[in-house]
């Protein structure tokens, strides 16, 4: 009964702020009706006023509405004027740095380690990043106005503004936003995204701050999921049990009322108006001293699972996470398209090097690429789990490889041959392939024709493997470490022989490229290059240390075996016979 009462209250939240509520009612409904003569005089005066307005302004709108008449002035409102001028100014590139654009609303602010992330509501229209500023409280200080670091936006998602890190414990806003400044939430304790999985009616929640150990299951009974618009009001939230907890990923039962609510919203999206709070989900610890993590996670429904589909749209897809790798993207996509990859999921971790322009130059009818904004730092494992869920409905197999890694088939087999061989074996859920790490190969400058033909000398022994997985075979916990996942009980992995398939990993490129690795690592449980821990790890460059200082012999390092296999294949298959150029 208590849960039902909570759910009834929760369902009423969906109508909060909608039209027709509050002090509405029919015209003259309160008190007794006026006499008929009085009504006639009132209506005569009313229409005389409308006629006078039409003469004065040159136009008048007569708007009818049920129950209660709604009057609209003949001239657009100040807000409509601002929106109209806003669109025109953006198109003309003439937005003042102090202009206020009514469409821009800050929904969330998160204090990341090196900057502040502002997430705008869907539909927020932004001019170029040089035409507005980040404001830090108190707003009357000229020293607390700074240019944004970058702006990212997608047609079907929120816009992201990356502001420089400001003073601690101050609210942040934008010079063109009409919403009030927002106090940033701290990144180290935050529920940052969530997915609704119709396959088992669960919600997958991604959270920082619970400090679960890598590669191991936590104790789910210690936690519960909390759904609601305001977690400070216990009567207005619904809780559900957590069924698995691992790393930064929690899976809990989706309450029936939440599923119904999400189906009622437009397109299944958890949308809100400017005066309402969104539906959020969080993680709460149970027992004495229980606490609820701050949350910005609005549950997003995955494509509805259809167990009757026997064949998926794509036999092979790829997930990757990258930051500022745009100059290598064309070669990576074109090459893998030629060998049989059909779909790409690119998780963009705060790139500011023009990745969208590069993708726009590629023929969308030939290359099925989805770019997903993933601003969360040190969260690669969570991003891969997120991608595996998104790819599950359309992809039979999904490879998890980096932008500097290229699948290579030294023998006569192809990618499709390998996949067909194991697709008929239902207990095989993961294909593991060895990686060969290539060095600078004597180069001091970036090879003009790409990495596959530019780097030809590598280490003799293979390093850690990478994986191609069946997303349906993954363990519900979605645990993944170094690009391979834990599988469901009864599912197995196989090691693919190096003569059949392997990965060329162009890991140690010319110093101009390699030094960018010192800016930070995306993996959650891997130390950054400048950290003084795990210096001897295989994730590091042997003998390099923690400082971005180029060794004198860098061009000659990591060169034990000359390997022209992939270079020869690329030159044979991709070279234009008329110009001698490669397509990238």
Swiss-Prot record:
Disulfide bonds: none annotated. One of its GO terms (cellular component) is membrane. It comes from the Eukaryota. It is an enzyme of class 2 (transferase). One of its GO terms (biological process) is glycosylation. Keywords: Glycosyltransferase, Membrane, Transferase, Transmembrane, Transmembrane helix. It is a single-pass membrane protein. It is found in: Membrane. The keyword Membrane applies. The keyword Membrane applies. Residues 16-28 have a biased composition (Gly residues). Its EC number is 2.4.1.-. Residues 1-33 are annotated as: Disordered. GO terms for molecular function: glycosyltransferase activity. InterPro entries: Glyco_transf_92. Residues 1-10 have a biased composition (Basic and acidic residues). Residues 314-525 form the GT92 domain. The chain crosses the membrane at residues 43-63. Belongs to the glycosyltransferase 92 family. This is Glycosyltransferase family 92 protein Os08g0121900. It comes from Oryza sativa subsp. japonica (Rice).
